[in-house]
Amino acid sequence: MGLPEINIAFQSKAETAIKRSANGIVALILRDATKGDITSYSYTNESEVVKSHWTTANYDYISKTFLGGPQRVIVERIGAEDTYDDALARLKNKKWNYLAIPSLADNEKDIADWIIAQRSAKKTFKAVLPYAANNEGIINFATNDIKVGTKVYTTAEYCCRIAGLLAGLPMTEGATYQTLAEVESITESTTPDDDIDGGKFILINDGEKVKVGRGVNSLVTLSGDKTEDMKKIKIIDSLDLIRDDIKASFEENYINVVNSHENKMLFIGAINQYFKSLQSQGVLYDGADCKAYIDVESQREWLAQKYDVSGMTDSEIEVANTGSIIFAGADITIQDCI
């Protein structure tokens, strides 16, 4: 506990960031009445899945998810007539990265809205859905008739495979041109460039193999802090991991520490060391000045609600007492892939 541990915690997180980013967790919601006494499952590999606990189709969805190499697959079971609300309530306080629901047919918007609401509440959940949500937290998978062996999958059914693929990628790799070796054929887009520009995650066939066209999410409309690079899954995944790391280190090592200016600067310094380590590993762009800082402007606005700060300099604002609140900001540039 305490400040001496902050640098150690951040350094540890930076050193393991790439490995941890390739160990993402997929959450599945499956309709299945085979074994109704258990509603939640957690598997670290396919061999742990008991076939008799699931229908043939659902066992296949779990297997397809593991093809991408996620660290873990969480499965929430619901009955044939149940809504998704109970499963989402169980998932709300669990740790995971990507959600997929193979049976999804009419509730795409509801699920997308739930994900967007969770992200607004500082969760880093994302979902692969057959739905154009115009949001960086939703991957709009838009390829149909995916033939694997004797089975042809719908778009919704194969979202689990895409979720597993994305969860298994490290921050140093993008999804673009990742091969799905098991796929024999698809219904190919006649306008792939337009689809990608429209926020669709599609598969393409180059004549030899089926692969991801480009690793984009469903974000299309740019405004404010929604910039062009936020259309890319790799960028959002990296931002999410960095956000989670900083939040976790703050909660583990800084809560209940005296909120003096000196301690604020120690915490900011620890974040900056973390950023430097990520730059050296190629996660953050090494040509950018990636840094955290006291957000003087936000701090001034907060103080102005309590007393007149019009005559105070930025330096005076920076060292002013802010109670239990830290006003911190950061400017970083994620390293993109070619």
Regions found by a protein language model. Give the residues of each.
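Small-residue-rich
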Residues: M1-E136
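Structured, hydrophobic secondary-structure cores that serve as assembly/anchoring elements
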Residues: M1-Y61, E173-T176, D195, K200-I338
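A glycine- and small-residue-enriched flexible loop/hinge signal that marks low-structured segments
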Residues: T83-E252, N256, V283, C290-E297
